[in-house]
Regions:
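Positively charged n-region of N-terminal signal peptides that target proteins for export
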Residues: 1-4
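Bacterial N-terminal signal peptides
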Residues: 9-20
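Exported/periplasmic ABC-transporter solute-binding proteins
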Residues: 22-24, 28-69, 76-84, 93-94, ...
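Short acidic (Asp/Glu) patches
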Residues: 104-110
Length: 269
């Protein structure tokens, strides 16, 4: 009877040990590799750079086996969510990135990671076929031309910088007299451009013609009146994927990333 008891105890001990050994250790569970297909790199920014950013994100995501999620549009539409889960923030101008860091997204951006990616030039978009025969800023300063501009987002003061670049005050005055509406952002300007055909000219960046080629022809501004603003990107302080975020930013400046941005109207460095 005693022998049977000892055998039973030993059997229980052996089974317990086997059960313990069959379970992965807590350390092993902690260090187990993450399934890449579940990784999402969340990236937020304005609508202007979005077409190029989305295409580049798709290529990078396929190469890495992850998803790069691009949320773009006017800042108020995404800033609250970005404060909760953004890994990266991209901008449509240098002052926009500064506004993000100092005002719109307080404490979110790691300012040491901000980098400038690409520039795009200012341009005049006209109705298909250019019925008014617009050739540049001189023409849009003349009476009888109705202009749409953006006074916000990445274009604060853009029209004034363009019109006044050569120091001709009459040209600035002429352009101002012809402005029919100051849109708060490019998205609102695009809606008005497509719905109100009384506008002859949309003073904007070249990239918007690439984004919607059927709605406008591109007329380059005279070199002496052309200005440039940038797209930049930065990693957030809250991101748990900083290394991956840096890899994506690096990719945007790679040969493949550059080709994508050039395709969408941005300038190669």
């Amino acid at each position: 009877m005693k022998q049977k008891g000892i055998t039973l105890v030993l059997s229980i001990i052996v089974l317990t040990c086997l059960a313990i050994l069959s379970q992965p250790s807590a350390r092993a569970q902690e260090t187990a590799p993450t399934d890449k297909t579940s990784i999402v790199l969340r990236t937020y920014g304005p609508g202007g750079p979005a077409p190029a950013m989305r295409e580049a994100a798709k290529v990078f995501g396929e190469r890495k086996g992850i998803k790069v999620e691009i949320t773009a549009g006017p800042t108020p539409t995404w800033k609250d969510q970005a404060m909760k889960d953004a890994d990266l923030i991209f901008s449509g101008s240098e002052y926009m990135m500064t506004d993000f860091a100092q005002k719109d997204l307080p404490g979110l951006i790691d300012t040491s990671t901000i980098r400038t990616l690409y520039l795009r030039p200012s341009a005049t978009l006209v109705r298909p076929g250019n019925p008014k025969g617009i050739k540049g800023i001189r023409d849009i300063a003349k009476p009888g031309v109705r202009i749409l501009v953006v006074q916000g987002a990445g274009q604060v003061g853009m029209w004034e910088d363009v019109a006044g670049r050569t120091g001709n005050v009459k040209r600035v005055d002429g352009v101002r007299r012809n402005i029919g509406f100051f849109a708060p952002n490019s998205a609102e300007a695009k809606k008005l451009w497509t719905s109100d055909l009384t506008y002859d000219v949309w003073l904007i960046w070249t990239i918007w013609q690439k984004e919607s080629p059927a709605s406008a022809d591109l007329i380059n501004i005279e070199p002496e009146n052309t200005i440039y603003r940038s797209c930049g990107i930065a990693i957030t302080n809250r991101s748990e994927r900083k290394v991956l975020g840096k890899e994506f930013a690096d990719f945007l400046q790679s040969t493949a990333g550059q080709a994508t941005f050039v395709k969408w109207g941005w300038m190669a460095p």
